[in-house]
């Protein structure tokens, strides 16, 4: 009799419809991977066979389309890799859904509250400790401390045809006693800004005396910093570095002592004296104003003092057999013996995929394909139901024989 075969066919077709329906339902779920039901025949010493059974349900881990969102805490994985997440009990899960937010403790978590893990940033300035044990990534709402200026630079083009100043000796209060005045802003231990005036006084052919004065300190006086010496070609050959330049003391802060470099400065016989560029390595304190995840997985904070600071780096996990992962719901998986242990690393290194900031990986469900599969599964279900109906008619014929 074909009742058992038909019932097994109905059960298999129903399971197939469940899988297809689940795919369609999750066609808009970020990071979702479509499933496929596999079947096998049942055989028990008879060539006729005993029907069909579900051999297993596999998932397709090919990439979904990368969809731009513009949100700073959204990040999409392309090719290999999973985000590594931990729950409050320390259990580890893996996901392809890169939608993250901040919890009440300012930890980066997914929408279910699982904490995103990565390599920590430590030291001053912070650097990523790759290879360390992954830990939760947080974005602390703390003030960035001020940094005292220790080095500064000024690139200047001086006119060799400039006459000597008409007034001697040099006086910062008399513009006729110098040829050019510039400035560079530096910072002390509390982040107080000091406007350091730099004066250039031509003392002879190819020679210029440089003086500095802290214009922010009313008690400051101009001091000799260095003597610039140029060769006949206008190239700076001596005096390129002025050391131990000190600021005044403001608001009880320790004065900053820094070096001032004039490398790449030139002397030419045309054009006005011109300061090309100034730089320095200090800054004032700053509040966190924004943050984002970069394409290399680094989490960066942006501060009101126009500085950035590394806060951590997202770690990715790879497996020898993705299909061996166990689905745990909420769009996460856990490792199994079949999947193998997780291999950890960072985006763009080794066999790990790349990250796209401000984007999410869409579901890899092909709706057109799933709708066709649903029609086929429905016909399969109807055909097995028809087998039962036909078998019933045959039994009725036998019962009615006289």
Curated annotation (Swiss-Prot):
Biological process (GO) annotations held by this record are:
bacterial-type flagellum-dependent swarming motility
**GO cellular component: a single term:** bacterial-type flagellum
Q: Which compartments is it annotated to reside in? A: Bacterial flagellum basal body
- Methyltransferase as UniProt keyword: no
Q: Name the domain of life.
A: Bacteria
Instruction: Supply the alphabetized keyword list.
Output: Bacterial flagellum
* Location (main, coarse): other
Task: Name residues in a coiled coil.
Answer: none
Report the InterPro entries cross-referenced here.
Answer: Falgellar_hook_FlgE_sf (IPR037058), Flag_bb_rod_N (IPR001444), Flagellar_basal_body_rod_CS (IPR019776), Flagellar_FlgE/F/G (IPR020013), Flg_bb/hook_C_dom (IPR010930), FlgE/F/G-like (IPR037925), FlgE_D2 (IPR011491), LlgE_F_G-like_D1 (IPR053967)
Q: Which NCBIfam families match?
A: FlgEFG_subfam, PRK05682.1-1
Family as reported in the entry's similarity comment: Belongs to the flagella basal body rod proteins family.
Recorded protein name is: Flagellar hook protein FlgE
């Amino acid at each position: 009799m074909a009742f058992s075969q038909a019932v097994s066919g109905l059960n298999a077709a129903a399971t197939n419809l469940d899988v297809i329906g689940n795919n369609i339902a999750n066609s808009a779920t970020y990071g979702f991977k479509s499933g496929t039901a596999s079947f096998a025949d049942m055989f028990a010493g008879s060539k006729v066979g005993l029907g069909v059974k579900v051999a297993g349900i596999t998932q397709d881990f090919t990439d979904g389309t990368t969809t731009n969102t513009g949100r700073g805490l959204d990040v999409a994985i392309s090719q290999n890799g999973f985000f590594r997440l931990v729950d409050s009990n320390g259990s580890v899960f893996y996901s392809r859904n890169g939608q993250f937010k901040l919890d009440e403790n300012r930890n980066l978590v997914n929408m279910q509250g699982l904490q995103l893990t990565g390599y920590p940033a430590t030291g001053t300035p912070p650097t990523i400790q790759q290879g360390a044990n992954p830990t939760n990534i947080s974005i602390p709402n703390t003030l960035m401390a001020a940094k005292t200026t220790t080095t500064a630079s000024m690139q200047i083009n001086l006119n060799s045809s400039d006459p000597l100043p008409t007034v001697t000796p040099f006086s910062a209060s008399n513009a006729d006693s110098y040829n050019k005045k510039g400035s560079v802003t530096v910072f002390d231990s509390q982040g107080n800004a000091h406007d350091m005036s730099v004066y250039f006084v031509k003392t002879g052919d190819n020679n210029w005396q440089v003086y500095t004065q802290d214009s922010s300190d009313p008690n400051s006086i101009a001091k000799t910093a260095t003597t610039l010496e140029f060769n006949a070609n206008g190239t700076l050959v001596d005096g390129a570095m002025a050391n131990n330049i000190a600021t005044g003391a403001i608001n009880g802060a320790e004065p900053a002592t820094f070096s001032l470099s004039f490398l790449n400065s030139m002397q030419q016989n045309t054009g006005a004296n011109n300061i090309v560029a100034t730089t320095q390595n200090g800054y004032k304190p700053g509040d966190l104003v924004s943050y984002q995840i970069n394409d290399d997985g680094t989490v960066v904070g942006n501060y009101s003092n126009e500085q950035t600071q590394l806060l951590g780096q997202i770690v990715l996990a790879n497996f020898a057999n993705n299909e061996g992962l166990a689905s745990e719901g909420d769009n996460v998986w856990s490792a199994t013996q079949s999947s193998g242990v997780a291999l950890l690393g960072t985006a763009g290194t080794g066999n790990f995929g790349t990250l796209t900031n401000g984007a999410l990986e869409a579901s890899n469900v092909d709706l057109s394909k799933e709708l066709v599969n649903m029609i086929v599964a429905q016909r399969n279900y109807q055909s097995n139901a028809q087998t039962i109906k036909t078998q019933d008619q045959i039994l009725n014929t036998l019962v009615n024989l006289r």
